[in-house]
């Protein structure tokens, strides 16, 4: 038995945070003993393992590792035995149990949690962006967006912006109203980043009438007037032609379907919709 300061080497194909957390939690169970932890992240090959174990052997360190690639795990175990080093495989046993329980094969993809974290934060950023630059609140968002949605009121610009945000796409949207000139920023972005949205006037009339009813207002307001709607749609189409952007008629389409068409345009560069 010895009270010498134990040394734990953390070896990981990612950041090594999982193994470090477990190691510190275990070390905390021993009061009065300080544990030295050396973390080596992004280990991808056998040569790197050789170098680490050679150093670890000088301190008779404990090896705690999270390596998802089975070949590297097996190699590390064999080399550690050669150096008479004790090892703890933090991920391997649980991966095997899950595979046995589900009958599925694991992907053995290193650093996958980091990839998922990046996707999550990209989505959060996109949602915050969509809220900040909704309904033309700040035209500067037009220049920062991955896609800019334009159209008259009630053509689903906001719900589409939020749907795209959940896909990690930063979407700004600009309402087109005959009495209000669109921001100059709209004409400064590449036309392929702008999507025009339109609806058949009959459907738009129904949607706006229902909106007024929900708000407790009469349907005789200009907002739901058929002639006014036709005027707005013609004005909007003129702006879209000036921008040179693709136009999607969302009549009869679910949000998911329209969003899918937007993504196709963005990624395939389609012009005619």
UniProtKB/Swiss-Prot annotation:
InterPro entries from the xrefs? Answer: Kinase-pyrophosphorylase, PPDK_reg
* An example molecular function term from Gene Ontology annotations: ADP binding
Which keywords fit this entry according to its UniProt record? Kinase, Nucleotide-binding, Serine/threonine-protein kinase, Transferase
Q: Which residues form the signal peptide?
A: none
Q: Which reaction does it catalyse?
A: N(tele)-phospho-L-histidyl/L-threonyl-[pyruvate, phosphate dikinase] + ADP = N(tele)-phospho-L-histidyl/O-phospho-L-threonyl-[pyruvate, phosphate dikinase] + AMP + H(+); N(tele)-phospho-L-histidyl/O-phospho-L-threonyl-[pyruvate, phosphate dikinase] + phosphate + H(+) = N(tele)-phospho-L-histidyl/L-threonyl-[pyruvate, phosphate dikinase] + diphosphate
Specify whether Nucleotide-binding is a keyword of the entry: yes
- The answer to whether keyword Nucleotide-binding applies is yes
Stated EC number for the protein is 2.7.11.32, 2.7.4.27
Binding-site residues, ADP: 151-158
Matching entries from HAMAP family are given as: PDRP (MF_00921)
What does the record give as the function of this protein? Bifunctional serine/threonine kinase and phosphorylase involved in the regulation of the pyruvate, phosphate dikinase (PPDK) by catalyzing its phosphorylation/dephosphorylation.
- Membership in a protein family: Belongs to the pyruvate, phosphate/water dikinase regulatory protein family. PDRP subfamily.
This protein's name: Putative pyruvate, phosphate dikinase regulatory protein
